[in-house]
């Protein structure tokens, strides 16, 4: 996971 709104797959919400 990352510090922003990205999931493990890298898709941004």
Curated annotation (Swiss-Prot):
Lipidation, GPI-anchor amidated aspartate type: 13
Keyword Phosphoprotein attached: yes
Disulfide bridge positions per record: none
Transmembrane regions: none
Topological category with respect to the lipid bilayer: Lipid-anchor; GPI-anchor
Sites carrying sugar chains: 4, 7, 9, 11
Keyword Lipoprotein annotated: yes
Protein origin, superkingdom: Eukaryota
Localization: Cell membrane
Keyword list, A-Z: Cell membrane, Glycoprotein, GPI-anchor, Lipoprotein, Membrane, Phosphoprotein
Post-translational modification: This peptide displays a high degree of glycan microheterogeneity resulting mainly from a variable number of mannose residues in each glycan. Both N-linked and O-linked glycans are high mannose.
One Gene Ontology term, aspect cellular component: plasma membrane
Name under which the protein is recorded: GPI-anchored glycoprotein NETNES
């Amino acid at each position: 996971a990352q510090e922003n709104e990205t999931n493990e797959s890298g898709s941004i919400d």
